[in-house]
Amino acid sequence: MEKVQQTIRAPRGTELQTKGWVQEAALRMLMNNLDPEVAEKPEELVVYGGIGRAARNWESYQAIVDSLKTLESDETLLVQSGKPVAIFKSHEDAPRVLLANSNLVPKWANWDHFRELEKKGLMMYGQMTAGSWIYIGTQGILQGTYETFGEAARQHFGGSLKGTLTLTAGLGGMGGAQPLAVTMNGGVVIAIDVDKRSIDRRIEKRYCDMYTESLEEALAVANEYKEKKEPISIGLLGNAAEILPELVKRNITPDLVTDQTSAHDPLNGYIPVGYTLEEAAKLREEDPERYVQLSKESMTKHVEAMLAMQEKGAITFDYGNNIRQVAFDEGLKNAFDFPGFVPAFIRPLFCEGKGPFRWVALSGDPEDIYKTDEVILREFADNEHLCNWIRMARQQVEFQGLPSRICWLGYGERAKFGRIINEMVANGELSAPIVIGRDHLDCGSVASPNRETEAMKDGSDAVADWPILNALINSVNGASWVSVHHGGGVGMGYSLHAGMVIVADGTEAAAKRIERVLTSDPGMGVVRHVDAGYDLAVETAKEKGVNIPMMK
């Protein structure tokens, strides 16, 4: 991949570079994904998650930008794995962009085949929100991480992580949310990463409190704050596959153990034991097969240590990076003895159509986001947990790129909020349109048997019809852009997922699209979980009037 050193930053304000606000939104969000404040390696078009890219190569990026600038309001741009391939006449209520990223026929859906195609320039890895142009930096996963640790606290520690120690690893774009999510729940956390730049970045953005290269110092500080029952987050430089076994050897058992290293990609995401970043980069180039094997061996040691900590009483869970699967394939037959985070903590939220709803101020003015915060506090005042989140986010979350906010809203709530936002744009309370989107990690938009759909009640973990139906209904209902991806989060062969974005530009047409899309999108989550036999989803569907023909 050619590296290009240029600073990309989304335009701000109300002057259009395109022929309409929906096209403008797509352009600004593509560029925002590559803002140095947002992207992990913008010079390589990498947004987050190992090699999750916004466009296939620099030529394709420029062609997408040029296409968006000339795209009419009754045309649709088609993007195939980060490359613009067609513009067709459609209609004003159709999506302006349709994206399909990293999709492979199942028999060929593996990293080896993907890399062959990538080498030929025929495909890119879109992760989830990288290739669908709705990544907002680490805040994008923060509330989900906060909810996960909060639910762990409720189930195991009396409702708070005060006086507990969490041990985790991986401080990239996704994992970087962990330190702040733990301290927001009152706990102490040691978060390990092999890359000093990742730790520095989290400290700079106030997601992590301190840095150390010493395990002894990390443990001393952690114990001090644990005793005081005060929160602190410690970024520890090192390799988790070395540090966790060392802690097991010393008989040190944290209260909570998880992991968010980029284990989904053994070649580009994970660093084997005994290698510096530079040595790893050299081996990756010279002998990728050996690199992958060493990575897998290190991951197996990593999981063995997590299992040992679980046996000694640590609450241990997989945070969705497929590390258990790798260890299992390497011969560790009890790798799945600890659960994934969705069945352990998140699925009840999915049954209510809840998920990571996000919005972005195209104006670039933080005041627009603060005004929308007030809407949440006013309109959802009875949801104290949600309001607490908004208040904490205002105080502790630093914006990356265009100002944005995330919060988990459910069926009915998303459409209500979208309507209000559109009215605020229409009456001038907000200075420019707002982009509304979500992660692909949502209640009804993903099939991922080792993550979002792990241990489904009816055994339908691998059924991939649901994300396809989600993308189809969002497209016909008028989402501004819709994406279908493969391999996000857990790697090639292990997931299919869909994303949507809708623009609130203050028009009556947008209001109708928002009502349709923000009803059917979370509605798919309720439907999917009703179909799998979850009582809470059935209750939600009946209470909200979701029309499900065969629901009993």
Curated annotation (Swiss-Prot):
A GO CC term attached to the entry: cytoplasm
Subcellular location as annotated: Cytoplasm
Active site, UniProt feature: C407
Record key words, sorted: Cytoplasm, Histidine metabolism, Lyase, NAD
EC number: 4.2.1.49
Species name: Bacillus thuringiensis (strain Al Hakam)
InterPro entries, per the entry: Urocanase, Urocanase-like, Urocanase_C, Urocanase_central_sf, Urocanase_CS, Urocanase_N, Urocanase_Rossmann-like, Urocanase_sf
Reactions performed catalytically: 4-imidazolone-5-propanoate = trans-urocanate + H2O
Cofactor note: Binds 1 NAD(+) per subunit.
GO terms (BP aspect): L-histidine catabolic process to glutamate and formamide; L-histidine catabolic process to glutamate and formate
Name recorded for this polypeptide: Urocanate hydratase
